[in-house]
Amino acid sequence: MGGIKVEKIKIKNLIFSYPNSEKTALNDINLTVNQGEFVTICGKSGCGKSTLLRHLKPILTPHGKTSGEIYFNGKSIYDLSDREQAENIGFVMQNPDNQIVTDKVWHELVFGLESLGINSAEIRSKAAEMASFFGIQNWFYENVANLSGGQKQILNLASVMVMNPTLLLLDEPSSQLDPIAAHDFFTMLERINTELGVTIILSEHNLSEVFPLSDKVVVMEDGKITAENTPYKIGEELKQNSMFAALPTPTKIYYSLGNNSGNCPITIRDGHKWLEKQQINEHFEFKSEKNRINTEPILELKDVWFRYEKNSDDILKGLSFKVHENEFYAIVGGNGVGKSTALSVISKINKPYRGKVFINDDTKVAVMPQNPQSLFLKKSVLEELYDAVFDVEKEKRKNEIEYVIKLCELDNLLENHPYDLSGGEQQRVALAKMLLRKPDLLVLDEPTKGLDACFKRKLATILKSLQKNGMTVLMVTHDIEFCAEYADICAMFFDGKIVSEAPPRKFFAENNFYTTSAKRMADGIIENAVLDKDIIRALGGEAEDLTETNDELNYILPKKTVIKQGKKEYKKLNVHNVVLGIVFVILFVMTQCLFCGRYDNWKNYVAQTISILFIAVAMFNLIPRKKLGKELIQNEKSKRKISKRTKIATLLILFLIPLTIFIGIYYLGDKKYYFISLLIILETMIPLGFAFENRKPKARELVIISALCAIGVAGRTAFFMLPQFKPVAAIVMISGVAFGGETGFLVGAITAFVSNFFFGQGPWTPWQMFSFGIIGFLAGIMFQKGILRKTKTDMCVFGFLATFVIYGGIMNPASVIMWQSNININMVLSSYVMGMPFDFIHAVSTVFFLFFATEPMLEKLERIKIKYGLIE
């Protein structure tokens, strides 16, 4: 009699949609995962796999509209405390670098335990246990930066498992790893599941490694679960599904030959045994590979040596190879051997200290980096595409964009922010940008990373079509199967150089470990079989030859697709703008050299003010500006009511904080300014306590406030050499308008306090904290009431008046109060008169920073608020 199955996770009718999105990311999800099971979730890019996984750890759940229930050990998952989540639910992310937070391996390993307050003896014991279990004792004290991608992912896994979770979630953990590192990683997962009994749920595109480990496979499409079964039976359900191409090689071959789900092989070993029993077509011959293209090299590297630091080890060690015109050249190799470094040298990002890189002068090169996010500069996919063809005439530009949207399947992503897309979707957008540049040489670094099997086929067809139209492709990848089927030449990269190269069949047939699944499955049975279709054809089946390109995929053949003209144009720079900009930069430098530090008469003050205008005019001419569409620039009438916490903050700021400063001056003799400053900060944080009432504040809410304070401090420090030329008031105003008056005051107060550690603390610190703080508070209140709008004009006018009247109006008499014992009206008036030139320069500089910073900063902060549901 079998034991009773204990439900670890139970999801009932889960529906989720992201903010400002009509499409549901998760649609009526129902799923049960029992204790100790290994469950694999698969599906096309953007189908909702990552979103579903993040719902299983509430602290990582994305902001949006959610309905339905999720139970963990029979208890609502939303009732788990942060500590219970950290201890019981582990999460390993797709990119190893995104999860590492410390500099040393052992620091990373114990970070979670230290955060939970575990005592030192227990931490040492658990760290030693994990290091031994995961085999990281040999690099226990190593710098994290020196680790390979596989080691980093093992470290992330160990750092999660040291907390002893009972549920482990993994989001495409092998997407950054080479095949051998991925195999080692999944072997470790198998041990965790079988030896420790940990329940594992992971999403993955590479199913060959995870199928044999899985108890259940879940297939998702458009936010829904479309299939759910054991690995041995799921293949039959997917015969007519696009996900069939993602199945492991033995499974795919088995069902392609018309078999039913009786004894379906899912491992290479099972596939090999099954293949031994099959009737092989003795007269079958593989299609002969073409000879290498006999054309001039479009790219040649000769004895290239490169290192990142003068005294560091060489990364490239005598690298030499040629890529001929109209060739598809693929480079494979393990993590950390120098493949991406070689591409950086080819693209001239880095320069070798020895050797030569030859590229024809008229060769147009486009490089798609390993991280596609480094290409994204705009706030929507459509804007990114327009940015790639900004120099193309309008009508032709539209046709090319319409074509590439259809080609790369971006129709439903055009209004999305590139950073909100899944990894595979980001790869498609990056590829589209590269195609729009129409290069002669297309350089791709891990282009299949994060792509589902269906779009990999589409990518292959695109690349072969580009070749047909005369383009040369150089690709670095871990995807052995992709190289074997579509490349013309494959090369092995090891120890800083290429050690072997050959056509794919010859290249992979001679390898025993770094080779395709089909080759390992057919080893000793079908000689020289490298691809799935080789085995299928040898057994008398039919297989589609995807390398034959479609006529309709001829490059830049326009296809009519309806796209919204929501793009925000940028004003292009011309020679006139550039010349004017350079002239005014020179005038600014000359003025500063002649008048810096001179404040002995009014003429010098005027000169300083004029110098600010010079640099403003220069930046106005040199920086492209947006032609913005109509957006929300004024707070809605329904949201203009002042909240309870804002009223409390008003009382604190207008009465309690001035009272604190007064007591500090007259009862503490102005000598306890550190105490007074800290007291002001504590008083400022009281309204935020009301903001977090009845809910759990997330770390990101505090991080964004800290980041704004850091920007203010860094800005004040960066411009220390220019008297009164400071961005602090501008940053504080923007903070208040974006997140409310209380946040504005807090940012102003903390910025003044922290920056004075660099400029000197003293009795003036509380006064500066109050002055900057009240500017941020008033900016927030005025926007809340609809008086102040999010426009350059409104912000600049308010910034000038606030800095000149409020900051100057407080700090000028403060100088008298701080240093004079017998104060009279003449002293106060004199302080105003003497301070006006300084206040004027400060006010003009605030206008300067607001003019250039208002739109980009408010745009980004607004996006952060919407995406993460932050408070105002």
Predicted regions and their residues:
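Catalytic Walker B motif of ABC-type/P-loop ATPase nucleotide-binding domains
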Residues: 168-171, 442-445
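Conserved ABC ATPase "signature" region
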Residues: 121-139, 386, 396-413
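Conserved beta-strand-loop-alpha-helix hinge in the C-terminal portion
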Residues: 220, 224-254, 497-521
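Conserved ABC transporter NBD signature motif
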Residues: 65-75, 355-364
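H-loop/switch region of ABC-family ATPase nucleotide-binding domains
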Residues: 204-205, 477-478
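ABC ATPase nucleotide-binding domains
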Residues: 239-295, 514-568
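Conserved ABC ATPase signature
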Residues: 143-147, 417-421, 425
